[in-house]
Amino acid sequence: MSERLPAFWAVIPAAGVGARMAADRPKQYLQLGGRTILEHSLGCFLDHPSLKGLVVSLAADDPYWPSLACAADPRIQRAEGGSERSGSVLNALLQLNALGAGDDDWVLVHDAARPNLSRDDLDKLLAELADDPVGGLLAVPARDTLKRVDKYGRVIETVDRSLIWQAYTPQMFRLGALHRALADSLVADAVITDEASAMEWSGQAPRLIEGRSDNIKVTRPEDLEWLRLRWANRR
């Protein structure tokens, strides 16, 4: 592990609508502790002294972003969101190039709806991967018993959970390598669910860095309620 923390750029893909939340607005704009989820997700990066700049990918017709105080932050640039996450991230990487980022610069991609990232986890990721030839991501070992099922919901087998980890964010890779992996996988119409899967598709083996299990992504209403209760108990 490196004792230094490398400088980095951050990308936040925030063009999704979060349909499973069944809310009146995209989930990243729901309130949590007096601010939007997106503002919390951005905050851990904006507070970090090693940040070189940040790009947030937004839907072209996003009516909520301009009302946020952070929209005027000069460290934040806006990129056009794509129809899928990979397109949003790719557009953000192109924006980073325009800002002067080089192919060997580190880029951290973080979910817009993952507001509980701790500074300790961010520092751990940066330190552990500072000299890594590939990069990697925060992740958490599977704790529950896992079942593989058929299309009818019948159990086929119990999976060895010692080999299974849940992928979290941030995910940290060199700009040039990530750009090539995403662009090539899109041309090949490969199934890409996160940046690590694009790197895997390109033949790389990202490293997993164990993080906190409470760095959850808000996907369903109960996730947001859990965070609200947890944050209320901190007071």
Swiss-Prot record:
Gene3D superfamilies per the UniProt record, alphabetical: Spore Coat Polysaccharide Biosynthesis Protein SpsA, Chain A (3.90.550.10)
Protein name: 2-C-methyl-D-erythritol 4-phosphate cytidylyltransferase
Domain of life: Bacteria
Feature type site, description Positions MEP for the nucleophilic attack: R161, K217
Enzyme Commission no: 2.7.7.60
Task performed by this protein: Catalyzes the formation of 4-diphosphocytidyl-2-C-methyl-D-erythritol from CTP and 2-C-methyl-D-erythritol 4-phosphate (MEP).
Site (Transition state stabilizer): R20, K27
Stored CDD domains: CDP-ME_synthetase
Tagged with keyword Coiled coil: no
Keyword Nucleotidyltransferase: yes
The organism's taxonomic lineage, starting at the top: Bacteria, Pseudomonadati, Pseudomonadota, Gammaproteobacteria, Pseudomonadales
Organism name: Pseudomonas fluorescens (strain SBW25)
Keywords for this protein: Isoprene biosynthesis, Nucleotidyltransferase, Transferase
Pathway membership, UniProt: Isoprenoid biosynthesis; isopentenyl diphosphate biosynthesis via DXP pathway; isopentenyl diphosphate from 1-deoxy-D-xylulose 5-phosphate: step 2/6
Catalytic activity annotation: 2-C-methyl-D-erythritol 4-phosphate + CTP + H(+) = 4-CDP-2-C-methyl-D-erythritol + diphosphate
PANTHER family membership: 2-C-METHYL-D-ERYTHRITOL 4-PHOSPHATE CYTIDYLYLTRANSFERASE, CHLOROPLASTIC (PTHR32125:SF4)
Family stated for the protein in its record: Belongs to the IspD/TarI cytidylyltransferase family. IspD subfamily.
